[in-house]
Structure formats: C-alpha cells, structure tokens
C-alpha cells in the first residue's frame, strides 16, 4: 500500500506497520481465525467514508448528508442476505462479540438462562465464560463434547436443556473441527420452546459455499465475524428471521452502539461481493482439502488430533504425547516463522495460559496460494521443530522464508 503521507507525518508508526508487514510476508500464518484481505477490502477500509457519522439505519438517520453511505450500507446488507439466503441482515456490529451481545439483549432479560458450549471444549468467551459479559449478565450453563469421540454430545445437550429449560441455546465454536448438526439443535430448542442462536464466525465461509450445512434455515439468529474465513475487514454481522429484525436493529443502535463505521461497512460489502464469486468457492474448497492433508500428515508424525481429524478449516492438536505445552509450542514455532496459538483442549488439565494444545487453520495460507504439497512441508517443519527443539533451527526458518517468497501476500500488487 502507498504510505507516502504517513512516511512524512509519522515515520515512527510507519516503522511499526512495516515490521508487521514483514512478519506477515515471511511467516506461515496458521492461526485459524486469521486471514489476508484483498487490496480492495483495504482500499475501502482506508477510504474517506471513515469521516461520515451515520447514526441510525439507511433512510432513517440522525444526521444529514447520509444519502451515499445509505447506498453503501444497503449494498452490504443485500449482498449478505444473498450470500446466506437470510431474511434480515444487520452489518453494523463492530465485532462478533458485539453481534452476540446484541442478540442476547434483543430478546432476553438479564439473568435469563442460556445454554452454550463450554469454552474449553471449543466454545467462545461470549458463550458464557464467567470472565466475559455473557457470563456476568446471564445465567449460562454449558454443554460439551463426549470424552471418547471428542465430538458434541447431543444427548448430553438435550438432557441439560430438558433439565434447565434455558431461554436460548447457543451453538457454534471457536475451536471445534467437526460438522455441527444444527437441525438436531433446532429440534431440542423446539422441545423446550427456546430461541436458537448460532455463532458461525469461524465457519461462515464454509457455510456460504455449501461446505458446511447452513444454520440459517434453523436458527432464529445467526451471528458472524466478517474476517476469518470470509476474508473481510475485522467486524461483525447478524442474520435473523424477519420477525426479529426490529428487536435486533434496536439492540445494536441505540442499544449497544452509536455511529456505525461506514468505512468498515464498505469493506464488508466488498468482501461479501468477493464471497459471491465462483473463485471464492474454489478457495474454500482448497481450504478444506489443505486442512485434511495437513491433519493427516501431522497424524503420520504422531500428533494427536482432537476428534481424530477435521471436517472444516481447523485442527485442534493435543501435544501431551510430544512432551511440550501449547504455550511452549507457540513460542517455538514462532521462532522459526510458523504462527499458531496455544489452545485448551477438551477436559483440559493445564491453565488456559499454558494449555495442552494448539489450534491451527489453513484459511490464511490458502489465500496465499498454498496447496497440498505445501501442507506436507508445513507438517514436516512443525514436527522437525518440535522434535529438535534443543537444536539450532535456522535452516528451517530459512526454508519457511523461501516458501513465503514463492507466494507473496498480494501477488498482483
């Protein structure tokens, strides 16, 4: 990108950006929730739309001069509805967490009981963690995975739901590598007359391209982030049935937010447009292929995959048999140029600051053009680095840098 002005006005900050640019360019990015946006997304994010205040919704604003940003928001909403065949869309949430908060506030009262997936079993902070607003404002109870299969225990979920009769059941996850049966969860919700909310932040790209069953026909509310597999700007969005549209919109504004970020909404419109193209479907298909190959290769090296494998874009790896913690593995792999994150595993015995596992995903490297052969190399690099962690690994770091040079971040820039 052109940083001509920043170079003159704030070289100190520009230096920091350049260092991060170099890190992204020459590291293998395996954090499952990260991706690389297109230059078009970044251009929209950096546009003068950032100057415009637009409290309210299109054609019903509290400020004048909104006729063109109204067009932008309408475009983003219509593209998002088309992408997921949804009745209503709100593109104003600043983040996935705020999208979740707005849904809770739209139909629930403080103290209401909600059933969500346990964070250590793959859920998310906003699904009831006691350190999060969700766990503080609502009476969250949790379901998790079966100890043997390490997949969602739907019988346990049903049993807990029948015993506690929550007002809402939340599904979706941040570290769950398998298909989620939304139809089964809908049936449980109907049995106890509960709202159904799905947080599809991680799998939105798979849902958009038919690689994961869509929650939209089943759920009352579906939330997502717009980065991750959707490859857009950092932000959130809400889809819902038309009958909840007013309640959801009011919960976002004036409920928990003021003015929307119009430059971000423009960038969301770009990413939704990109996701409607055929080449995006091919990209997501490659993400799934890459993740499966990476998982199989790691298994061949003796790594234990939670649930035995993957159906989506991520892998959760139990490192116990490798005699290294998630924290130490994250630091070690970072030193050679592979970026991962430490992650708790189901029935975790270590602190969330240490962890027994790591979570990895392929959306970012697939955006760069990595395919199956590169996945085999990544598995080799990971295994070699962990097995030879007491040795000098400079040759691995150099090999990683060479692969990254072959696949620049923006090949047509």
Curated annotation (Swiss-Prot):
The record marks 227 as: Plays an important role in substrate specificity. Pathway: One-carbon metabolism; tetrahydrofolate interconversion; Amino-acid biosynthesis; glycine biosynthesis; glycine from L-serine: step 1/1. The keyword Transferase applies. Keywords: Amino-acid biosynthesis, Cytoplasm, One-carbon metabolism, Pyridoxal phosphate, Transferase. InterPro entries: PyrdxlP-dep_Trfase, PyrdxlP-dep_Trfase_major, PyrdxlP-dep_Trfase_small, Ser_HO-MeTrfase, Ser_HO-MeTrfase-like, Ser_HO-MeTrfase_PLP_BS, SHMT-like_dom. GO terms for cellular component: cytosol. It catalyses: (6R)-5,10-methylene-5,6,7,8-tetrahydrofolate + glycine + H2O = (6S)-5,6,7,8-tetrahydrofolate + L-serine. Transmembrane segments: none annotated. Its cofactor is pyridoxal 5'-phosphate. It is found in: Cytoplasm. One of its GO terms (biological process) is tetrahydrofolate interconversion. It is an enzyme of class 2 (transferase). The keyword Signal does not apply. HAMAP family: SHMT. Homodimer. This is Serine hydroxymethyltransferase. It comes from Clostridium botulinum (strain Loch Maree / Type A3).
């Amino acid at each position: 990108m052109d940083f001509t002005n920043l170079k003159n006005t704030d070289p100190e900050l520009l230096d920091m950006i350049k260092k991060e640019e170099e890190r992204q360019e020459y590291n293998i990015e395996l954090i499952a929730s990260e991706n690389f946006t297109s230059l078009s997304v970044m251009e929209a994010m950096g546009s003068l739309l950032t100057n415009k205040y637009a409290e309210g919704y299109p054609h019903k604003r509290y400020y004048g001069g909104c006729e063109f940003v109204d067009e932008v928001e309408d475009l983003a909403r219509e593209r998002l509805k088309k992408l997921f065949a949804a009745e209503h869309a709100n593109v104003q949430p600043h983040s996935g967490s705020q999208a979740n908060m707005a849904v809770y506030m739209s139909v629930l009262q403080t103290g209401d009981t909600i059933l969500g997936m346990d964070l250590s079993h793959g859920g998310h902070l906003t699904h009831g963690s006691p350190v999060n607003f969700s766990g503080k404002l609502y009476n969250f109870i949790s379901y998790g995975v079966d100890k043997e299969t390490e997949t969602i225990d739907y019988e346990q979920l049903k049993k807990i739901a029948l015993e506690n009769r929550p007002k809402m059941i939340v599904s979706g996850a941040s570290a769950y590598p398998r298909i989620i049966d939304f139809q089964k969860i809908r049936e449980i919700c109907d049995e106890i007359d509960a709202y159904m909310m799905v947080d599809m932040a991680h799998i939105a790209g798979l849902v958009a391209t038919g690689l994961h069953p869509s929650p939209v026909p089943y759920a009352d509310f579906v939330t997502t982030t717009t980065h991750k597999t959707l490859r857009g700007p950092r932000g959130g969005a809400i889809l819902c049935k038309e009958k909840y549209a007013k309640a959801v919109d009011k919960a976002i504004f004036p409920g928990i937010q003021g003015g929307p970020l119009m430059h971000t909404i423009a960038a969301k419109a770009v990413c939704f447009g990109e996701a409607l193209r055929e080449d995006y479907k091919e990209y997501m298909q490659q993400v799934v292929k890459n993740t499966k190959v990476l998982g199989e290769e790691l298994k061949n090296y003796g790594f234990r995959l939670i649930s035995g494998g993957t159906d989506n874009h991520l892998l959760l790896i139990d490192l116990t048999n490798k005699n290294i913690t998630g924290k130490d593995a994250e630091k070690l792999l970072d030193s050679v140029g592979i970026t991962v994150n430490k992650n708790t595993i189901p029935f975790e015995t270590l602190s969330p600051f240490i962890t027994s596992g790591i979570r990895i995903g392929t959306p970012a490297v697939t955006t760069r053009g990595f395919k199956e052969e590169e996945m085999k190399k990544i598995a080799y690099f990971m295994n070699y680095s962990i097995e030879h962690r007491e040795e000098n690994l400079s040759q691995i770091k150099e090999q990683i840098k060479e692969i990254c040079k072959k696949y620049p971040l923006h090949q047509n820039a």
